[in-house]
Each structure stands twice: as C-alpha cells, then as structure tokens.
Amino acid sequence: MHSCSERRMMTVIWSLCLIFCLSNSILAIAKDLCLPDQRDALLEFKNEFYVQEFDPHMKCEKATETWRNKTDCCSWNRVSCDPKTGKVVELDLMSSCLNGPLRSNSSLFRLQHLQSLELSSNNISGILPDSIGNLKYLRSLSFRTCHLFGKIPSSLGSLSYLTHLDLSYNDFTSEGPDSGGNLNRLTDLQLVLLNLSSVTWIDLGSNQLKGMLPSNMSSLSKLVSFDISENSFSGSIPSSLFMIPSLNFSGPLEIGNISSHSELGYLYMGENNFNGPIPGSLSKLVGLRDLSLSFWNTGRGIVDFSIFLHLKSLCSLDLSYLNTRSMVDLSFFSHLMSLDELDLSGINLKISSTLSFPSATGTLILASCNIVEFPKFLENQTSLFYLDISANHIEGQVPEWLWRLPTLSFVNIAQNSFSGELPMLPNSIYSFIASDNQFSGEIPRTVCELVSLNTLVLSNNKFSGSIPRCFENFKTISILHLRNNSLSGVFPKEIISETLTSLDVGHNWLSGQLPKSLIKCTDLEFLNVEDNRINDKFPFWLRSLSNLQILVLRSNEFYGPIFSLEDSLSFPKLRIFDISENHFTGVLPSDYFAGWSAMSSVVDIFDTTPQVHILGVFQGYYHNSVVLTNKGLNMELVGSGFTIYKTIDVSGNRLEGDIPESIGILKELIVLNMSNNAFTGHIPPSLSNLSNLQSLDLSQNRLSGSIPPELGKLTFLEWMNFSYNRLEGPIPQATQIQSQNSSSFAENPGLCGAPFLNKCGGEEEEEEEATKQEEDEDEEKEEKNQVFSWIAAAIGYVPGVFCGLTIAHILTS
C-alpha cells in the first residue's frame, strides 16, 4: 500500500500533467487563431494579383509571397486579427508589389470585419468597385498612389466609422457642375463628402476631380485635414466649411482676438479652378497649421492678405501663383512666428532692405516675384533649408554669406542674371540649380568635394573648359545637367556615379566616345548628348539599362549600323529615341522594334514612375527638356510631355532597306521621322496601326509603290510628308491625306490626283467617258423635248380648230 505522502505526490504529478495538457491545448488554440474562412479569403486575394516590382524608384516588399495554406493567417506578414474572434481586422499591404485590378467580386470584400485597409503604392488598376462599401467597419482606407480611375463609388458614404480616407495620386474623375443638366442634383462625390460624418482625414489630392464642393459641409465636424489639391474643382469654397459646429468666435475681426475650437488643421485646396475673392472667413480657422490656396483665380482682383495674419498657428502657407494684381510687402508675413514653409511664387513682392523675418523659416520659395536685388534678410535665416528665388531679375554675384547658412541644402537660383565664376558651395548642399544665368569660367573642382550632392544643374550658362575629371569621384549624384555651355574635351571615362538617373550634356563641344561606364548606371532614365562632336559606334550596351526612357544622340558623329545579331536592341521603357543627324548605316530587320514595349499597345500598364523622377527634383521645380522635330519644325519638349510624348527620329542618316514591318506594333507612337535616309521598298501598311500618330515624315528616301489608303484611318494624323521619293499611283482621297499641302507629295513623278492638278490616267478616261455619256443623254433629252413639243402643239391645235368652227357656226346662224 502507498503511504499518504506517496498518494499526495501522485496527485500532484497527475495535476501537473493535466495542467500541462490543458495549457498545451490552450496554446495550440491561441497559436492557430486564424479562422478557415478568413485564411481562404486572404489566399484567394493573394492569387488575384501577380507580384512583381514595377518601379525602380519605389522599393516594394513581396509580402503576400510568405502567406501559406495550413498556417495561422493571423501570424502572416502584414495581417492582424482580433485576438478574441480571429477575424482579420487590419490588412497593411502598402508597397507590396501587387499588380492587377481590384475586381468587384474580390475575396477581399469577404473580410467584413476589416477596420484598416492599406493598399497604397501598389499597381492596382481599374475602377474602385462599389463593393468597397461592404466593409462597413472600416476606420481607415488608403489607395494612395495606385492606378485607379473612374468615379469614386458612392458606397464609400455608407462607411459610417471611417475616419481616414486617402485616395490621392490616382486618376479618379467626377461629374462637372452641369454634366447632368441639373445643378441641384448632388454628384456621387458630393454625397460621399456629406455622409462621412466621422471622418477626420480626407486626401483626394492629385486626381482629375472637377465640379463644385457641396454647399453644406458642416456635417464634417471632426475634420482635421482636408486635401483636394491638384484637381479641377471650380467655383468658390463653400461658406459652410467655416461654419462647422465646433467653431466659436465673437467680436470684431482683429488680430489675435479670434478663438476657435475647430479641429481643422490642414487645408490643401491649391492647383484647382477655384475663382473669385479668397473668402475672409478663412481667418476664422485659427487652428490651421498648413494652408494651400495656390493657383487661385481671383480674376486679377486685389487679395486681402490681412486674412492670413489671424492664422498664428500656420507652419506652412502656399499662396503661389494667385491670379492677382496685388503687390504685397513680404514683411506682412513676418508676424507668423511659427512659419516654417512659405511659397509666394508668382506674386509681385516688395522686400525691404531692413526686413526682419522669423529665423525659424526652413523653406522659402519666392520664384517669379519680380525681385531685382538679392534679399538681404536671408543672411539671418539660420534655419533655412530650402531656398528658391528662381525666375527673377537679380544681377551680379551671389553673396558669399549665403553659403555660410549652416543648414542650407536646396538652392534654386535659375533664370536670373547672376554672373562671375561659380561660388564655392558648402558641404551641406544636396541640390544646386543655377541654370539660365551668366556664370562663366571653368566648373570648379571644389564641386567634387560635395559628398551629399544629388542634383547639379548648370545648363544654359557660359561655362568653358572640360568636365572635371574629379567628377568620377561622385558617389551620390542623381541628376547632372550641363546643357548648352561651351564645354569641350572628352568625357571622363568613369562617369559619373552609379546612382545617376538623368544626364544632359547636350549643346556643347564634347568629343571622343560615349563612356561605356554608363552601363553601371542601372537607374538611368534620361540621357541627352545632342549637338556635340562625339565620334563613336552605336552604344548597343545601352540595352542593359532597362529603365532608360529618353535617349537623344542627335547631331553628333555617331556611325555604323544600329542593328547587330549579337547586340539586338530591346528598350522596354523607351519613350523618346532620337538618333537623327548622324552617320548611321545599314539595314533594319523586320522585327527591329519588337522589344520596344513602352511604345506598343502594352505601354505603361505597370509603369508607375512618378513624374518627379522624370521631370526633375524636389516637387518638380526643375524640368528636363529636349528639342525634337515635330511636323517639320523644331520644338522644345519640357516637363510633363515626357510622360505622354512618344517619338522615334532616325532622320538624317544613311539607313537603307525596307522600313521594318514591326513599326506597326508601336501603337502609342506620336511622332515618326524616318526622312533623309536611303530606305527602299514600299511604305508598310502596318503604319495604319499607329492610331495615336500625329506626325509622319518619310520624305527624301527611295520609297516606291503607292501610298497605303489605310493611312486615311489615322484620325489624329495632322501632318505627313512623302516628298522626294519614287511613289506612284493615285493619292488616297481620305480627308487626313487630302488636307495636306501639295508640297508633302512633291517630287514623286508617279503620283497623281488631288491635291495635284494632274489627273491620273484612269481618271482622264473615266472623265472622257462620263462627258460623252452626259452629251448623249443631253442630246436624247433634247429629241424627247422636241417630240413632246409637237404632241403638245397637236393637242392644242385640234380643240382650237373645233372651237373656232363652232363659234363661227353660231355667229352665222
């Protein structure tokens, strides 16, 4: 028999075993919290998209690739569940490399307990389905920087718990104020704004929304941030925005005596079509920290700038490019002691030499303000980080004290009349833009010591000498533009930095070869070496730069073939290809353009490169530019044109053989110039597939055969030139072709028909036959008319004789 102590020991052991088993069971349950229906919905959602990096500038994590069946979905990357119910409540897939549309029957909408849905910075395309309204517990929703378009679904207005809505940087549209003919009918967007009574944060910026804001916005009583900038909204700001219930003010409007309990702290309404006076009611929003009213159309009226003096909490104020004739004293804004960012671009400014400004200001943008002297007050702006005084009328040298400001990093002094040698820049400089001035001398080697330099733009000055060899030491530079100076010599062999995205050295006197070390610049998008003396073969190695979008080699001394069996070209993102006015030779194979997908029908489906990377730096204040031949004239393409303008120019070379049939797959092409070569054969009928083509130049070649009548289907084709070839036959009668000047068909002896005066042979025979037939018909008609005349005379004669005899008989009786 067991003793009592042994029995107690056994009891303890069994109790411990039981506790251990129960705890394991509980841990097992806790470990596998995910519900099967939630797991299935997530896995189906994963399979609705394919995962692939789509933008070299925006790194993404392939989060959904780690999701596996038969594992706890609540422990998956970017997924959060309610610990009590096992329902998925948060899905954060921002920058997760997702590509594809969001379908209306997506399994996402089965996750009906979602409270937070973050899908921004993905390549999610198509229309945002109404099914989004099924997620009725959503508190936060973000599709920022996707590829969504169409109308914002009205079902968003049913999300009564929603506090954060971000649909910015898409292509959403909305009805205009008169699109339905009923000005009293609320649009879907207006209904959404009226129903989101719990929302604190709304960001609809950078879309294509238009129309007017709803007249009654007082229901948005909890609004903290409201961003509708960079759209096409019109009309005026509804007064209800300044009358939300929490506002409280009394007494006369004097500086400092307005009090408000409004939650509204961020209001971005810039870059729309708002018009009329800026409402004085803005002064009631004394809690505002950020305010943007840029590009407001006051109708050249006078702006009452005293409105802004009440906004003592302002940290950021953007009043750039107001359409006003008002001149304002910059000292007007010196009372805003919390101001960190101020943009008054496009406003006529008066700046006193004794001006004292808040030293806390970090960003100051005074572009196009008619400033004639370098502002002296800047010497005391010890916190200045970003300075833009471009497009003014400032002459002389840049004062040396500017470079002693300890935090200065971004400087834009372009489009002035600064002269002298380039100043010695401080190590803090990250971006220096000094284009379109009168700087001269050599580029100083001290520039190479700027270890943080990302952007250097010295275009359109009078610099001479060679590109410093020490440029090879750059490690961080991304944009280097030395365009239109008098630089000579050869490129540094190890150019420039592997981080380079944009290089423009066009319109100089550079010689030698294009440095093959550029092959290391895997992020290079923009390469322009036009109008130099570069003597080299075609750089086939550029094909390895998969991000290259603009390639301009025109007006140099490049030579040799542009096709090689060993080095076939494939430019998946190329938008502009200009190799004109060189000495290229050889034949192009039929499939030469097969790999140029950015100009084909699949263009840009997964290309989300933000314009800022193509256009320039820091909010787009600098823009790339190239000179292209379009419709027979040279034109400068600047800024956003790069994103939509697709052109191929191989003119002025010695290319021969047939025009490649594969040219017909480049359906996004807008300009095609193959003139002044030695192309032979027929004009390929596949050109009729270029449905976006606006300009076509095939002149000065040796083309034969007829002009394909199918070209008449190209409704956007405004200009074409077939002159100086060996074409023959009738000129097609399509309107697009017949509207051209006769010079577009000159020196083709075999061409005939309008707009030429000479008729085609068949046309002359047809006209003679038609004329003879008309003469025969006229003669036959004349004979018939004579017969009818005799019959009519006979008909009239018989009754006349009868009546005459009858009357005579009566009279004699």
Curated annotation (Swiss-Prot):
Annotated Pfam families: LRR_1 (PF00560), LRR_6 (PF13516), LRR_8 (PF13855), LRRNT_2 (PF08263)
Disulphide linkage map: none
Claim: Transferase is one of the keywords in the record: no
Compositional bias ranges of the Acidic residues kind: 763-781
Intervals, Extracellular compartment: 31-786
Primary location: membrane
Transmembrane segment boundaries: 787-807
Membrane topology note: Single-pass type I membrane protein
PROSITE patterns tied to this protein: LRR
Stretches in topological domain Cytoplasmic: 808-813
Region (Disordered): 756-785
Carbohydrate-modified residues: N69, N105, N123, N195, N216, N248, N257, N380, N484, N673, N689, N721, N741
Cell location: Cell membrane
Keyword terms of this UniProt record: Cell membrane, Glycoprotein, Leucine-rich repeat, Membrane, Receptor, Repeat, Signal, Transmembrane, Transmembrane helix
GO biological process: root hair elongation
Biological role stated in the UniProt entry: Plays a role in root hair development.
Protein name: Receptor-like protein 48
UniProt organism field: Arabidopsis thaliana
